């Protein structure tokens, strides 16, 4: 049993409220899936940029200095914005494949949650309200979003088992 919510905003004036609206919807679905939750937020893409949302069980160790190491290896600017066990890497779009390959090589403990120009996926084990709070989803803006609450029935309760999933950019 799971719960799925989604919101596509047609009114640009509501975009700053997307995270708050989506969080409230997700919390309402807690009874359908209290084991874990995930949220995908689609923001405005930045021309010439791409993003990877990454996750680590050892975020302090894996994320400290990661942007600098990637920048050095790629010869291009990379920024990292950390949110609890997740972080968003922002880099030149023409370096997307190289960035991902370099990340896998220099930070093998880091997992990619999403890849693209506008998507960010955050997911963890825990009640939906707690997961949303950890990543400050209510403060996010965007054009649309998807949320999922999970009650594991046939598999383990894990971060990687939480939805949504991203198939690539």
Where do the model's predicted regions map?
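N-terminal glutamine amidotransferase
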Residues: 1-169
């Amino acid at each position: 049993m799971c719960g799925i919510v989604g919101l596509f905003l047609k009114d640009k004036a509501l975009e700053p409220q997307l995270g708050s609206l989506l969080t409230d919807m997700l919390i309402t679905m807690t009874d359908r899936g209290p084991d874990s939750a995930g949220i995908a937020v689609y923001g405005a893409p930045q021309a010439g940029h791409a993003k990877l949302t990454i996750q680590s069980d050892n975020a302090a160790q894996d994320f400290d200095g990661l942007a600098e190491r990637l920048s050095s290896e790629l010869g291009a600017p990379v920024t990292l914005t950390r949110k609890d066990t997740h972080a968003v890497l922002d880099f030149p779009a023409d370096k997307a494949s190289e960035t991902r390959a370099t990340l896998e090589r220099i930070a093998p403990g880091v997992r990619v949650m999403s890849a693209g120009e506008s998507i960010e996926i955050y997911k963890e084990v825990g009640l939906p309200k707690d997961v949303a709070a950890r990543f400050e989803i209510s403060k996010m803006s965007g054009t649309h979003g998807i949320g999922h609450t999970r009650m594991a029935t046939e598999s383990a309760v894990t971060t990687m088992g939480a939805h949504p999933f991203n198939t690539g950019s």
